[in-house]
Amino acid sequence: MVRTRKWLWIILFSGLGVGGAIPVLAQNSGHGYEGYEPAGRFPHSVVVADLNKDGHLDMAIAGSAERKITVLLGDGRGGVAANHSYEVGRGPVWVTAGDFDGDGHPDLVSANSGAGTVTLYLNDGRGRFVKRQELEGFQGPVALVAADFDRDGRVDLAVADTLLSTVLVHRGDGKGGMNLVAQYPAGSRPHILAQTDLNRDGVVDLVVTSLGQHTISVLLGKVDGTFEEPRVVKVKRFPHYMAFADFTGDGHEDVAIVCAGDDTLVLLAGDGKGNLRKLAEFPTGVNPHPVVAGDFTGDGRLDLIVGNRSTNDLTILKRDGTGQFTRLPDVKVPDDPIVLGAGDFNEDGKPDLVLVFASLHRAAIYLGDGRGGFTPMVSSPTR
């Protein structure tokens, strides 16, 4: 597996346990929803990290209709201590974190699809951010990966552009600057971009979904920071988010991918050499988008949970250790879950869940009990 910095928790690779019931967040009449935090209008992406180096997990959320990213600083008890926002370009649909200037603090970068730009904010070390630069030359950037592609100790950036149908790779200079060094085909209408290590060589690989061709493209990384030509794998219609783990127990990284057009989760088995084959399909709710994976029941096995936007519920798939999953009863949530993520927000050693709701313009935290049960975090009435 490619190693990431300790403070960075990427939402797409976290998960939710399945052993207990997940309660619906209660509406507080006259005050909105308890436990919800403002997340910008039509939030579209979230990243979790310790942004102010106080030992507590925080999160940054891209609000696609407000030209801003919202930073929620955690209090270590499952609540939010502060809420700040930062202006970016029009239509921010993705936000991620990486230490672009090498000072040990996670910086933030957003993909602004409407403006055709990428905005980099540098962290001042206290969880406040100063705008460093606006990268141009894009037409429709929709997803980002921040990682050290060439293993020079500096964070680089890959950008999926849905209108250019490419992945653009930028080399970081370790001071907050970036230069475009390569472009790779990504299929028609690339949508989600993620990092993993499918061939177990310790070098970052990239996987990108194509909404136009209903495929994923695997870009195997080389030690010099370049990538091989894409290996294209056909999946179901409209592939969205992915989760990576050894789901089959053979020591190789596999891929679970949600396909919204067929209300299906597709499991692709890896061979440890970068090749993927379709292993199984599992039904979900209607219009699934996010998926997260993790062992939240304490049985040593990774389960999957999918957020279904049109039915406002979660599909829970419990893994049996052979790559097969059993579907547990669906869980209703108050709105359309566009993004899921996880981290130990109340620092009890048990992973918690983050749900981002697009139409409510809010995010909520469910506190995990370590046995698969989750309880919504209740705070003061929202503003």
Locate each region found by the language model.
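Beta-propeller blade termini
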Residues: 44-53, 73, 93-102, 142-151, ...
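Hydrophobic beta-strand segments that make up the repeating blades of beta-propeller
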Residues: 59-62, 108-111, 157-160, 206-209, ...
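Glycine-aliphatic tripeptides that mark coil-to-beta-strand junctions in extracellular
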Residues: 55-57, 104-106, 153-155, 202-204, ...
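A short loop-to-beta-strand structural motif that recurs across blades of beta-propeller domains
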Residues: 68-71, 117-120, 166-169, 215-218, ...
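Beta-strand-rich domains and repeat architectures in extracellular enzymes and scaffolds
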Residues: 37-64
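Bacterial N-terminal signal peptides
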Residues: 9-20
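Blade-edge motifs of beta-propeller repeat domains
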Residues: 21-41, 73-90, 122-139, 171-188, ...
